[in-house]
């Protein structure tokens, strides 16, 4: 992934903020790729990555048999911090976006649905919390 960042006209504070944002974006993309690979290794078919609806985004949508799984990926220095970063409002947006995905995919109607939280820590290790609710 190549990202061009223009920094010559920015203040030092703005450049630092932009660099943190770029690092966070790259870290998030690496975490999502790691989790996607793990779901594939477990026999899941990946239907979509970073699927955007009108009200939000779902990081990963996979199918295994009659089960459809909507996965939110969180990365942080620690598992606890990553888990705590998922808010009720964010989970609600993910659920609403999942419903929009299903509205646009009538061939998937009737499948069982689940929401997972994949938590990736700084070392790259991760855990999947299956069937999350708040």
Swiss-Prot record:
InterPro entries associated with the record: Restrct_endonuc-II-like (IPR011335), tRNA_endonuc-like_dom_sf (IPR011856), UPF0102_YraN-like (IPR003509)
Family statement drawn from the similarity comment of this UniProt entry: Belongs to the UPF0102 family.
Residues making up the signal peptide according to the UniProt record: none
GO MF terms, alphabetically ordered: nucleic acid binding
This protein's name: UPF0102 protein Dshi_2830
Database matches in Pfam families: UPF0102
Species, as recorded: Dinoroseobacter shibae (strain DSM 16493 / NCIMB 14021 / DFL 12)
HAMAP family xref list: UPF0102
């Amino acid at each position: 992934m190549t990202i061009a960042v223009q920094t010559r006209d920015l203040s030092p504070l703005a450049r630092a903020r932009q660099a943190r944002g770029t690092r966070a974006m790259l870290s998030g993309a690496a975490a999502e790729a790691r989790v996607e690979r793990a779901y594939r290794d477990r026999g899941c078919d990946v239907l979509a990555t970073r699927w955007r609806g009108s009200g939000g985004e779902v990081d990963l949508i996979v199918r295994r048999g009659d089960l459809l799984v909507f996965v939110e990926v969180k990365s942080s220095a620690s598992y606890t911090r990553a888990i705590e970063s998922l808010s009720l409002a964010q989970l609600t947006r993910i659920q609403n976006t999942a419903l929009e995905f299903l509205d646009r995919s009538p061939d998937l109607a009737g499948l069982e649905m689940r929401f997972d939280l994949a938590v990736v820590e700084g070392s790259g290790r991760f855990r999947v919390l299956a069937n999350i609710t708040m």
